[in-house]
A protein has these predicted regions:
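Active-site phosphate/pyrophosphate-binding segments
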Residues: 258-262, 266-293, 383-512, 586-606
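Acidic/histidine-rich
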Residues: 154-185, 454, 459-485, 520, ...
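Glycine-rich phosphate-binding loops that contact phosphosugars or nucleotide phosphates
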Residues: 287-436, 516-560, 581, 589
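Generic C-terminus detector
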Residues: 225, 565-606
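Conserved phosphate/anionic-ligand binding catalytic regions in large, soluble enzymes, centered on
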Residues: 24-33, 98-102, 170-179, 247-251, ...
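Glycine-rich oxoanion-binding loops at beta->alpha junctions
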Residues: 49, 66-83, 271-284, 307-343, ...
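Conserved short alpha-helical segments that host acidic/polar catalytic motifs at enzyme active sites
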Residues: 1-244, 248, 260-267, 271-288, ...
Length: 606
């Protein structure tokens, strides 16, 4: 969600801050702002809308400050306008903030009683006035320490001071924050992506820590204000992921490169020579795990639902799936034999991180499936399984979804073999099929010409449904989510067998319904459910896999056939036309495909 940047340099920083804010646009935002310090004054410019609008402001172009902070805001408290945009400033302090201050109402009441006047509707402004109040009697370190201890909720902060022209303060709790190092300048940012264009040397702050950034060095402190030492990490470059190349949108590029990312993932984990799966340094023996709980949000939750079928099919483990935002609010009965798997593309999803934190506090086994190996969820889990997809820029996840289900499938195969739930011959055959998957995905991607005209019908409809059974059900949910995210068309995914229990009442003449009916064990039953919606006037888009057998059904509006493979792998192929359907629907509507309204790539608030 919100993204922050800070730069302390020996040259003017406004251009670099604007460029870094552009790197943070993928996180999702509705307003932007910048503040620099020069000639003993804090100069602040904010605007509703895109960073481009901010960049064109003549005040920004004339900024000369060599120290500054910037922000892209996703509204949580207060309307998305220039008043509520960050930075928020008093006469002496300016703050950018990612997170939510849960006790802001009480703090504001206290501060108003002290004579402070507020300009905005945001929770962030209380931080500005708290620091200002403490600075009346304390130095910067103690003022920051006292302020942070007063705040309930989550935050990543960047702070500059009128009377301290040589430093930026950064602090975090719950929301990610990184420090970068450059020649004669240092940086602060919400993630490594915003900093990579300037440096590959980075330090991540842990919860409760804060830092003081000067041009030539950085000091780190724990929550008690005691100096601590932190490691500097050197990041590898993946610059090709930040360039659209010949594609109109990052999402189009990310859909098309899925054969490559799947091939990379298979290469990382599958030992073809020895017909085995390598999951190095797995910290538990197979008999120490009797159940698995898979936890995620949004698309990652759908990945977990997909994996549940595989774990149940290929192992004798008990499997449960939880939405991360609900997990903490139930009375969980933690068992030491349960492996908790946390799935998050960014590795910074606030609700997923909070669920991980709860499991850690209860001494549970924790494993992360992430795309960003330097992320908070990865760093705080006992074991990490990276999905090796490269940076994903489009807000609507595509290649990361296939990457997540690939790694979860690989884990289910490995545990099935180790636990002797699967014979080696079957394991070998499934590995052989898996190695062919990238080629099958590549062939399925050629479906464009059929998908483009189909998308017109979805754009003209009031809503749509996506139906699936068994392995196909989580893919139906994911397809509906993609259409909602990108085209702003109401779409719902349902188990095909549930139609008669309510959803059938919504079917009307001409309503588009996607039916996922691969030729698996559930095929005939799903076709029967399809006939029920056709009988009520629905326009059915049937997505199945190629077969010599004829489809025994009448009045199907359109049929798309993906390549054939074993049942385990068909969900990968069924996903492709759904991604393209959402993409082309949004394209024809002229919407911002890479940055859909109201959404964020990295959901760092609960």
């Amino acid at each position: 969600m919100c993204g922050i940047i800070g730069i302390n340099s020996n040259k003017p920083v406004s251009v670099s801050i604007i460029n870094s804010l552009k790197k943070l646009e993928y996180r999702g935002y509705d307003s932007a702002g910048i503040a620099t310090l020069s000639s003993g004054q804090i100069n602040e410019v904010k605007s509703e809308g895109r960073v481009d609008k901010l960049e064109k402001n003549s005040m920004v172009q004339n900024m000369e400050g060599k120290i500054g902070i910037g922000h892209v805001r996703w509204a949580t408290h207060g309307l998305p306008n220039s008043i509520n945009a960050h930075p928020h400033s008093s006469q002496n302090v300016s703050v950018v903030h990612n997170g939510i201050i849960e006790n802001s109402t009480l703090l504001k009441k206290f501060l108003v009683g002290k004579g402070h006047k507020f300009k905005s509707q945001t929770d962030t402004e209380v931080i500005v006035h708290l620091i200002t109040e403490h600075l009346k009697t304390d130095d910067i370190i103690n003022s920051i320490k006292k302020t942070l201890k007063s705040l309930h909720g989550s935050f990543a902060l960047g702070i500059i001071f009128k009377d301290q022209p040589d430093l930026i303060v950064g602090a975090r709790r719950g929301s990610p924050l990184a420090v970068g190092y450059g020649p004669n300048e240092n940086y602060l940012g919400s993630d490594s992506y915003a900093l990579k264009s300037m440096t590959n040397k980075i330090t991540y702050l842990n919860d409760g820590e804060f830092c003081v950034i000067k041009k030539d060095h950085v000091e780190f402190f724990n929550e008690d204000g005691i100096k601590i030492n932190k490691k500097v990490l050197e990041l590898s470059s993946d610059e090709e992921n930040y360039n659209k190349g010949d594609y109109k949108h990052f999402m189009a590029k990310e859909i098309e490169e899925q054969p490559i990312t799947l091939k990379n993932g298979i290469k990382e984990y599958v030992d073809s020579a020895n017909k085995d799966i390598n999951i190095y340094n797995f910290p538990w023996k197979e008999n120490e795990i009797t159940s698995i709980t898979l936890i995620g949000c949004g698309t990652a939750y759908h990945s977990c639902l997909m994996a549940k079928y595989w774990f149940e099919e290929l192992t004798s483990l008990d499997v449960s799936v939880d939405i991360a935002s609900e997990f903490r609010y139930r009375k969980n009965r933690f068992k030491k034999e349960t492996l908790y798997v946390f799935v998050s593309q960014s590795g910074e999803t606030a609700d997923t991180y909070a669920a991980l934190d709860l499991c850690k506090k209860n001494g549970m086994k924790t494993c992360a499936v992430v795309n960003v190996i330097e992320s908070s969820i990865a760093r705080d889990s006992e074991f990490v399984l990276p999905i090796h997809c490269g940076t994903e820029i489009g807000v609507a996840s595509t290649k990361a979804f296939l990457g997540q289900i690939l790694i979860l499938y690989i884990l289910s195969l490995k545990l099935g073999l180790l636990r002797k739930d699967m014979k080696k011959e079957l394991f070998n055959q499934k590995l052989k099929d898996l190695k062919e998957l990238p080629k099958l995905v590549e062939q399925t991607l050629l479906i464009d010409n059929k998908i483009q005209p189909i998308s017109n019908t979805f754009n003209e409809a009031k809503g749509s449904m996506f139906l699936g059974r068994g392995f196909s059900y989580p893919i139906a949910l994911e397809g509906a989510l993609k259409l909602k995210e990108l085209s702003y068309i109401h779409a719902e995914g349902y188990p095909a067998g549930e139609m008669k229990h309510g959803p059938l009442a919504l079917i009307e003449e001409g309503m588009p319904v996607v039916v996922l009916a691969p030729r698996d064990n559930y095929y005939k039953k799903t076709i029967s459910n399809m006939q029920e919606v056709i009988a009520r006037g629905a326009k059915v888009l049937l997505i199945t896999n190629k077969s010599k057998d004829e489809i025994v059904s009448e009045n199907i509006w359109e049929t798309l056939e993906v390549e054939s493979t074993n049942e385990d792998l068909l969900p990968f192929l069924l996903t492709i036309p759904l991604q393209k359907l959402a993409y082309y629907s949004a394209l024809k509507k002229g919407f911002d495909i890479d940055k859909p309204r109201n959404l964020a790539k990295s959901v760092t608030v609960e």
